[in-house]
Amino acid sequence: MHDHDHDHSHDGHHSRRAFLGSAAAAGASATLPGLGWAAVPQVGDDMAKAAGAWLAKLDARRRSQAQLEWTNRRREDWHYVPRGRPGIAFRDMTPEQVAAAWDVLGSLLSARGMDQVRGQLKIEAVLGELSGSLSFRDPGNYSLVLFGDPTGTAAPWGWRFEGHHLSLSAMVAPGHGVAVTPVFFGANPAHVPARHQHAGFRLLGEEETAAFGLIRSLDGAVRSQAIIGDRSLGDIVSGPGRELALQRVEGVPLARLNEAQRDGVMRILQLYAGTMREEIAAAHLAKLREAGIEALHFAWAGSQAPGRPHYFRVHGPTALLEYDNTQDSANHVHSVWIDPQGIFGRDLLKAHYQGAH
């Protein structure tokens, strides 16, 4: 099995009805700029408490590795390939420190999100076994790093947890909100092969199944408008350093879809936003609704048969989701979720610094 990645540079799982209902409530209660963020300060407080507790378990040398200045250039230097990373890797932590690091993740992620991270570590070990490179494909090679001081009350701070096929970035602008994108989830193998102890496991299977169901529900001119290419794109476009590369929306606008099809698109977005705590997920959906769901576009490229190379995208003013499954005979997924208005919290930072003057 080959990996063609190249370096170019608390809450439980909620039902869809509960998710949409909480999103509506968040939208209704928010009067501040950035609709839906009114319920988010608790998340920032919880993350600060968990990050501070993790730091407290580190000695001075480890702490200097774990905590970088807010202005450090690595803060926006994310990637999903195997490479050196700032911070401290799981394999270099004590069990107590690992547990505290998981608490940092748990302060942001939902039960589904935590399962997603555990699943990625599981298939990284699978990839190590299948490729015969256990030391290179090491589930312990995922690192946590902090930027800035989580124990302060006024200054922005953030953290990133990252390794092969996984990148989670969070930032807090006190008084303004929490930002959580870009989020990258990958899977290799996307479908664990037979004769392996985890045979049949599909880390991003629910997302892929939802997308295939959606494209198959389209017909005629609507399907023709959705399809932007006969071949998959081969990878996501909005990779590291290229988060805003897709300036033009393509595909079919949701305004042309029927209610069930629009629900299908929202289901895909929910699966990604739903990796975050309910407050964050609801805020993102409220922001989508404020901008107008009809402005979202759904695009597809490549085969419409599972197991063949394919690519899909959901794109609008406040959301960009890309999913590509091309490599390794369409058994190797790259996917990214981005808020184009709030990459690394740039919108919140702008508001924060304007408010400070």
List the predicted regions and their residue ranges.
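N-terminal twin-arginine translocation
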Residues: 12-18, 28-42
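A cross-kingdom marker for long, charged
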Residues: 40-60, 65-81, 86-92, 96-110, ...
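Sec-dependent N-terminal signal peptides
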Residues: 21-22
